[in-house]
Amino acid sequence: MESFTTAHQRQEAWLARDLALLNDAAAFAPMVNRADLQVGRRPLPDDPNHLFRWRLPRVAAPADVVFAGFVTHILDYHHEWTREFVDGYVVEQLSPTARVVYQRFEPGIPGIAKRDVCALEVTRELAPGVKLASFRSVDRLPPAPGYARIDWWGGALCTTLDGGQTSELIYLDRENQGGWLPAWLVNRTMKQYLVTQAEQVQRFFADGGPMALRRPEP
């Protein structure tokens, strides 16, 4: 987990590393290889939890809309593709492109503790219709009483495709769940979890996504 006091010094390094990984499918061992969805994994030396990557080659909404729902307004829509999500709030808006976000999750499975995460989110517009986000857990807030703290590494790249009405969405996810949930179990169960998540994201943005996220016609 990153120290909040020094996290601002690491933002550009996070963005550069995530962009390289998001664009490097060959660096991930394939787990799912469908025309509409690819999922892969790779181990890294600093954590026994694997880094996962999923890719939706075509989402039925432009990048601005998808990025708005999947990143900018995550607290409004996260429950649409993550059923464990309960609530959250913006802890601090550090700049127009950086903020600290807190979220809570309740698995609802006997013996599995509730989880929370406090993460620094950094975004960039790389080009018109190309948006990048990096997420890292930071020690800005202590875990809520009764919650185990997730140590999270995430990244998202959304690119509008030719024609302007659809986009590609790629996502990185590594979750050290903390508590008594071991890495080997998380690694084993993440494939189906991520397939379900990606398919729900696809459905959420079907037909252009929610009207509330669409820009008005000029």
What is each stretch, according to the model?
Residues 1-218:
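Eukaryotic helix-grip
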